[in-house]
């Protein structure tokens, strides 16, 4: 938010964290940059944020399941705010949770940082578009604003699912059967997505 404030792209910002350390560093960075319109709130998720004080919520740097939990505890954000979400892991759990939160994906962007691929989702209240098993992992092609990395995310999630499927197959536990079947369906769907994306199945 400091860069956005300095560039005049936002008027004010609220930074939250459940730990004092990151908030203290945020205050120090804001002071060093000469930024005054950044409020730092020690709280869990959005619990310490006034619903009337923000119109855009950014949640980044954590797993998709944790982002979903934060939104579930802040229904006002789901109703009224534009939410920019960047899951560090388990994006499929976040995408799967959005319909129950009354949120629809407006757009997605893929970015690569330090060799890793990340999805950034812009979501807002609305009727969600149905996603296939594979799209829960990779995103829907028609929603991705820049498709240059879409082939890479398909390959990455395909490999991730292959490793997970092999692990569950080796375990042979009956309790893993439902999970294994779900992963197989997602893997098959991603394989089909790759064929459609490349056009020739390569």
Where are these regions (language model features)?
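Conserved SAM-binding loop of SAM-dependent methyltransferases across substrates and taxa
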Residues: 1-10
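S-adenosyl-L-methionine
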Residues: 8, 14-55
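Active-site capping/gating segments
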Residues: 14, 18-19, 90-135
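Class I S-adenosyl-L-methionine
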Residues: 24-34, 95, 99, 162, ...
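Short loop/edge segments at beta-strand edges and connector loops
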Residues: 42-44, 87, 107
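Active-site segment flanking the S-adenosylmethionine/decSAM binding pocket
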Residues: 48-74
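Conserved beta-strand signature within the Rossmann-like core of class I S-adenosyl-L-methionine
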Residues: 78-94
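An accessory alpha-helical subdomain
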Residues: 133-202
């Amino acid at each position: 938010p400091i860069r956005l404030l300095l560039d005049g792209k936002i008027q004010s910002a609220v930074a939250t964290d459940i730990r004092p350390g990151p908030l203290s560093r945020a205050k120090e960075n804001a002071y060093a940059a000469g930024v005054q319109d950044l409020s730092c709130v020690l709280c869990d998720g959005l619990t310490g944020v006034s619903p009337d004080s923000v119109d855009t919520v950014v949640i980044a740097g954590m797993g998709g399941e944790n982002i979903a939990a934060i939104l579930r505890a802040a229904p006002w954000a789901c109703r009224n705010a534009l939410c920019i979400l960047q899951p560090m892991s388990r994006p499929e759990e976040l995408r799967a949770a959005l319909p129950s939160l009354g949120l629809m994906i407006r757009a997605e962007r893929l970015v690569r940082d330090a060799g890793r691929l990340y999805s950034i989702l812009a979501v807002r209240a609305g009727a969600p578009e149905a996603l296939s098993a594979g799209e829960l992992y990779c995103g829907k092609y028609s929603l991705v604003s820049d498709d240059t990395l879409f082939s890479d995310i398909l390959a990455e999630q395909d490999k991730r699912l292959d490793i997970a499927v092999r692990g569950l197959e080796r375990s042979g536990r009956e309790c893993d059967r439902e999970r294994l079947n779900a992963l197989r369906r997602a893997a098959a769907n991603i394989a089909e997505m790759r064929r459609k994306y490349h056009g020739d199945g390569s």
